Curated annotation (Swiss-Prot):
One GO MF term attached to the UniProt entry: dihydroorotase activity
Sorted UniProt keywords: Hydrolase, Metal-binding, Pyrimidine biosynthesis, Zinc
Pathway recorded for this protein: Pyrimidine metabolism; UMP biosynthesis via de novo pathway; (S)-dihydroorotate from bicarbonate: step 3/3
Cysteine pairings via disulfide bonds: none
Known cofactor(s): Zn(2+)
Family as reported in the entry's similarity comment: Belongs to the metallo-dependent hydrolases superfamily. DHOase family. Class I DHOase subfamily.
Lineage of the species this protein comes from: Bacteria, Bacillati, Actinomycetota, Rubrobacteria, Rubrobacterales
Protein name: Dihydroorotase
UniProt-listed CDD domains: DHOase_IIa
Gene Ontology CC entries for this record: cytoplasm
NCBIfam families xref list: pyrC_multi
Pfam families: Amidohydro_1
Role: Catalyzes the reversible cyclization of carbamoyl aspartate to dihydroorotate.
Protein species of origin: Rubrobacter xylanophilus (strain DSM 9941 / JCM 11954 / NBRC 16129 / PRD-1)
Amino acid sequence: MSTRSGSAAELAIRGAHVVDPSSGLDGVTDVVVRGGRVAAVGRGRPAARELDASGLFLFPGFVDLHAHWRTPGREDEEDLESGSSAAAAGGFTGVVMMPNTDPVLDRPALVSGLVRRAERESRVRAFVAAALHAGLAGERLTEMRLLKEAGALCVSDDGLGTQSAGVLRNGMLYARSAGLPVILHCEDRTLATGAVHEGAAAALAGVPGTPASAEDVATAAALVLAAETGARVHITHVSTALSAALVGFFRGRAAVTADTTPHHTTLTDELVFALDGLFRVNPPLRPGSDREGVVGALRDGILDFVATDHAPHAPEEKELPLEEAAPGFLGHETAFAALYTGLVLEGRLSLGRLVEAMSCGPGRWVGGLGSLSPGSPADLALVDLGEEWTVSRRTLASRSSNSPYLGRRLRGRVVGTMVGGEMVYDRMGARLGVRT
């Protein structure tokens, strides 16, 4: 991320409805920013500059624990500038980049190089997840202590999953000794042989499916090993009701957290009937019964966070038959609106819980983010909850356009994003004024 020292002059953001569960804030007030940090919260504080945010909602900046910015290796699909621009447009102020790049982020020099590039090129705070094992091949563990020294926030097997329980157990033990959390993609590839969820929709559409057990078996194994090793483990993109229940069972038995995605909580496997490669994703979209179980687990805090699994793809990788298309969706720019429209407005999730899952919780996970309490980094998202908009290729800042929400009308749109006191995304027009 480029220099984010913020302006030395105080900026008062006036009249927004502030929602910050970490600080117990839920009401109209002012937030004063100075030197890149939150200086004060409360009405009537004087400041040299003012931002009229009346009618808007203000949240701690969203933090995404799971994204693919395709750097290095596939900058034609996404790079640090475009990925961070998409993140900023979606209200994200912090993003964790996954290691399944080309080359894989399995060596200290690659990690430190990407950390330095991100400091220069990213509009938001970008964190690096290094590979759990060399080449993400599931065999030889990486030098995790050296990866941590190079700047890795965590290690992960995302993209392929670790197929050997022995390797996974040893990896957890090593990660624990190195002081690194582990983000796990739970998938048994001996079961995951289809392109979509194995169920009634796949059968009717005539498309080979992958059973839910491909995720559930791997999730159960990961949780058992997490409890045994004491490693700090995060299960990503939970998509089945049983996997969510397993996470709940191990709460208190293991140092485990978990996330689900916007698409697994707002879409279902009925999209298979489109027979469109755009809708292929891994883990696959599930039936309504799984979606309801996952949404309930998110509502109840069993699933801690929402992460997007932002996965850009070139058109030629998605404009294929469903079975041949590359799996993955864009996520940054539509995440909040999809969840607000599909869950909050439908009465299935409170706004406060959504902010906790997108901002406060993942901000604590990465450390020191996700709060508007005085002294915290001035990372925030301003949102117009009343604005309706249609997702289109024209509205997307990403280099790619593989969003499952293309053509859908959503409500709630980010209009401003601040990182370290600096506006990195601004659709507010002439709301900024100077006091005399």
